[in-house]
């Protein structure tokens, strides 16, 4: 609780009126705080407890084994399924401070992925209000070079990320973000089904060896028994469902 008060103090330094967490926001922050503490200090125990829970839950609800055991790689992503208007943006600001407090690793890049330019600008304005260093991707590689942790969060639309750049334009290949990335994803699955699958592959490349905070109000649109891989991924990642 003391840590959470400290995060609020940091993001409220420039804000008027001051932010107060609603109960579901507090729970999201608290669950994340506990999770990151376990991940940093007791990873083997965390993995064992998750698999024990999965075994017991699967037995009680007859899951039929469609969710495999947790492995270490599953621990590098947490997701928030929260309704529109529930303050997901604010949680992102606190998640930023939580990750830096626990120092899971020192990120080579910090990236916020959004579905469109309008949301990118909105995120940039709100992050600045909270005193979180950030900048928008302006369409040039010069915006990327040297974009290390001390320079803050780079905000970019998912539509501008590609696996391999062909020709000119504002797109950028994910390979330029080398190393361990701290990735924030806002509604990153929006789009046509084929687009969503392509974007998911690009996100996974960016997140390789890194860590992901993802939030959405519409996970239900992509979660179905027909797509068992995605269903399993988010069944393991969602830390709070307030949809």
Predicted regions and their residues:
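Short loop/turn elements that form and flank the Walker-type P-loop nucleotide-binding site
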Residues: 35, 74, 106-107, 149-150, ...
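Conserved H-loop
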Residues: 85, 115, 217-218
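Flexible phosphate/Mg2+-sensing switch loops adjacent to catalytic phosphate-binding sites
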Residues: 39-75, 102-111, 122, 137, ...
